[in-house]
Amino acid sequence: MPHRSFTSDFMQNYRAPWWLPGGNLQTIWPALFARRTRGPVPEYRRERWTTPDGDFVDLDFLANDVSRRRPLLVLFHGLEGSSRSHYSEAFADVAWRGKLTYVVPHFRGCSGEMNLAPRAYHSGDHEEIGFILARLREMHQGPIIAVGVSLGGNALLRWAGECGESASRLASAVAAVCSPLDLAAGGHAIGRGFNRVVYTTMFLRTMKPKALRKWAQHPGLFDREALLQARDLYDFDNIFTAPVHGFTNTEDYWRRASAKPHLHRIRIPALALNSTNDPFIPADSLPRPEEVGDWVTLWQPGNGGHVGFPAGAFPGQVMAMPEAVTAWLLKASGITPRVPAEWPRAPMTVPAAL
């Protein structure tokens, strides 16, 4: 397992800037206003792959000319995310500066075009993770490292737990950032108070229209009238996500899709980063060291919000977390990045010769 370093110590002891107190501000401000990249906005080239069920997934590859022997960083996005989410662009910047290959596979329906099959995506979709990583492994000669953000991280660790030792055939190391590894705890938290008013409303604003478009593709797939009345993610999952993807109801979906009960089965280096002030994830639901086994490293700083982790002077930047997580993944794969003494003000880099 990778040992402690400057970057890991920084993240484990992370403190938000004084001008961004509290988990909600540390979540909302970075997503909307903080600087995402040290360089230009990343450019992508898109590939469309046919899936085993006759559908398609769209993958956005960073448009940099890099040898296939360099490490490949794969990012699985969060709920309603994409390659243009703030964290996706921040990780793309890390890859661009480190001359890494980088790709964001979009979950079904998240690339800007509705998928065709009578399904969407969900938090426990480890089969989709496995299909994508296996295809990338066929294409790429160098090591593959993968990070999942929020929903994508739960699915990624769920895949790693499901595969056990065989996961190492496809990936050298994996990481989950602010992932609701106990879906029931996270689902109930986001359905209460401020979270319900702000975050639930934001998610349903795009999720309900997409579900209705899916119903138009496949009439009768779910109870359309009930979906129109859904007021929170519990209802949405009960009416759409669970039955469409083979679960009995919301409770069954949350229980079977959660990665937390499977963390002890992971047999490749894995990192789970969660702030204890994440508005979406109760701190008392986070995994404890005795629950995860020797292959899983836990970073649980007191600050950071949900996929925030802002740093620096106003208006702040969000590159420190992606650089620290990428550094951990590289070290777990036997590659030592270069971290200057001025980091995170100055960027982490990756040696040209590997």
Can you name each region flagged by the protein language model?
Residues 119-139, 158:
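Alpha/beta-hydrolase active-site loop
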Residues 276-297, 301:
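Conserved loop-alpha-helix segment in the C-terminal half of the alpha/beta-hydrolase fold
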Residues 239-262:
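Active-site nucleophile elbow and catalytic-triad environment of alpha/beta-hydrolase enzymes
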Residues 51, 62-116, 131-135:
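Short, surface-exposed "cap/lid" segments of acyl-processing enzymes
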Residues 23-66, 310-312, 316:
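N-terminal cap/lid segment of alpha/beta-hydrolase-fold proteins
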Residues 302-354:
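Catalytic active-site module of serine/aspartate enzymes centered on a nucleophile-bearing elbow/loop
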Residues 2-9, 140-245:
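Alpha/beta-hydrolase-fold enzymes
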Residues 266, 272-274, 278:
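Short beta-strand/loop motif that positions the catalytic acidic residue
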